[in-house]
Amino acid sequence: MFTKTSLTAAALLMAGGAALAQTQPVIGLITKTETNPFFVKMKEGAAEAAKAKGAKLLSGAGKTDGDNAGQVTAMENMIAAGAKTILITPSDSKAIIPAIKKARDKGVMIIALDSPTDPADATDALFATDNYKAGVLIGQYTKAALAGKPAKIVTLDLFPGHPVGAQRHNGFLQGLGLQSFD
């Protein structure tokens, strides 16, 4: 988690450089939710980086994971408040594209965090974990922890079709040495 928080802070600092002509750069951070501990830490890291660089951080999130409309509203509000750079963990990699296009048409830099958009070139940049590799590592850890003992593994896909979940899932199976659900 420290690495992701650090990457978020680095992205925030890079984004702030694009807005240095202003007295105080205005940067937005939109997460999937405000309750997930990962996104809470991401916001804390961004707030620390913004304070250190004298930037104003605006933050927003969907009400729940998957709330694209909430993310669109947050993006529109941030643009209206003068944000020149917005970092976002898109809840829906396709549905957010029209809002991103509008923002970029207004000269706002958009950086996707952790979850790529579809198409990937809809944003100016992507800072992300290698989610497949993360899944492989978790699968390998699980296999080692089981030490050859039989186990029944169940995986839940709360957001079917989301690339991050699919990559982690497939990596996990690979790390366990499984080729299918059988």
Regions found by a protein language model. Name each.
Residues 3, 9, 20-182:
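A residue-level marker of the well-folded mature domains of exported/periplasmic proteins
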Residues 16-18:
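N-terminal signal peptide c-region/cleavage motif recognized by signal peptidases
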